[in-house]
Amino acid sequence: MTGTGKKIIKETNAAADHVTSEAAAAGKDATRKLARFAAAVRYDDLPKPLVKLMKQCVLDTLGLCIGATTLAPEAKIIASYVKAMGGHAQSSILGFGGKAPAAWAAFINGSLAHMLDYDSTGDGGHTSVATIPVAFAMAEKSGGVSGRDLIAALACGADIHTRLAQSVDIQEWAMVEGWLPTQLLGYVSGAATAGRVLGLDERQMENALGIGFNQMSGSRQMAVGEAAHLRSMQAGFSGQGAVLAAELAERGIIGSKEIIEGRYGFFKTYVRTETPLWDALTGRLGTYYSLLETHAFKVWPACGITRVTTTAASELRERFGVRAQDIEAITVTGSLDATRLLCEPMDRKRRPKTSIDGKYSIPFTTAVMLVKGNVTLRDYTAEGLQDPAVLAMADRVTYRNIPDADAGTEGGRGSAATIGKTTVEVRTRDGKVYSSKPQSVPGDAENPVSDELLEAKFRDCASFAAKNINSGNIERAIEMIWDLENLADAGEITRLLCA
């Protein structure tokens, strides 16, 4: 979110402690406006840069689903459970092969998409994992869903997810109240995505959003201390709930109304605010897509907050020529909530036992970059987690906090909450001190990744598939994704990857 947007949020929340008549009027029919937008959005209405972004997100996300099948130990457990559930073979299980009912396919593919913590980010967490597995599960089940309709569904889902996040002080709220926005908002954004694939009308879409809302969950406790497998699975839960919401609405189930603005709606119950930014939520619907300014791709497979410290470590190597063998001490200075979350307990963060613990550790990930000059998927394998040089470097990492009010962490997404506010300082054995305070990170909108990098990332992830994928199918899938708007049946892509 821009600095202006963050300032507006603070001023607005400080200016009122009750619902004014103006605020009530501004929020009138907010849920219905979102439902109307989701039901009506068409491919031809989308700006070309947004179409390109959606295709990049598809390439990125599908590859990550496949790679997780052998790199994340929980993947096999979930796959065996889903397959044991049986049911109609409707939608593909990426990386493992086979099919499951659409809701279960959305559950496992949504879980797989976030397991490597390599997925793209935006305001509100990880919009792609909350929407793309849902869209493909529904597209395969329905059959004959065009690439253009799929893109429209993804665009509306991602936009609604982003708008919900930008209408509140998302970073501060999520940290203080303890919610994980990806899962929490994913029930509604995913329901909009699934509903658009199904072609729901406005009333059905409103019901779908209401059914999704009533399933909302996602506590940040799953990421405190030793990270639980549930952190990987958050978009699986919301994805399954989203499919359920859309399918029930299609069959006539009536959902809750006014789920955003109502007496017990999203703002009152989850955010506890009387003064959200209504214009950020419903202003210029269908004509303005702020995710074009905020969406970011990861070039390193770890928690978004580590992107800043990893960038700093990279800059120390490249700009100052700092060599691993010369480093005596490393100090990370950053905001209280973000830095503490990824640095405590320090003994566990320096010696992560699992892949997800390593990805959620500033000491370990910073050490990898300082020792190796890059951070890859292999650094979080069982072997990578035991690298003696990396562990020795992690032992030299300490951290200091800046109060959040001073660091300015309000608003923003993942790394955006710490860009320009986090410093990595190294002291060498000869007493010299070097520091880096990144103002941007690779993969952000202002520092975009190339299509070639995303293709290489896709191929690398696909090489870890539990069920081997023919190299020809991998290349054909890449071609189909770039040409998605011309596909008559978008489900061809996932079927090809599971052939």
Predicted ranges, named:
Residues 140-244, 258, 262-263:
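Glycine-rich, mobile lid/loop segments that gate access to catalytic sites or pores
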Residues 113, 130-133, 137-141, 160, ...:
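Short connector loops/turns at beta-strand edges and beta->alpha or beta->beta junctions
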Residues 2-125, 223, 227-240, 247-499:
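Terminal-appendage/accessory-domain detector
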Residues 51, 55, 59, 131, ...:
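Hydrophobic face of alpha-helices
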Residues 67-68, 135-143, 191-198, 245-248, ...:
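Well-ordered alpha-helical scaffold segments within catalytic/enzyme domains
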Residues 99, 105-160, 164:
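Function-dense linear segments that define catalytic or interfacial modules
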Residues 128-136, 186-193, 239-244, 306-308, ...:
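Well-ordered alpha-helical segments within folded domains of soluble proteins
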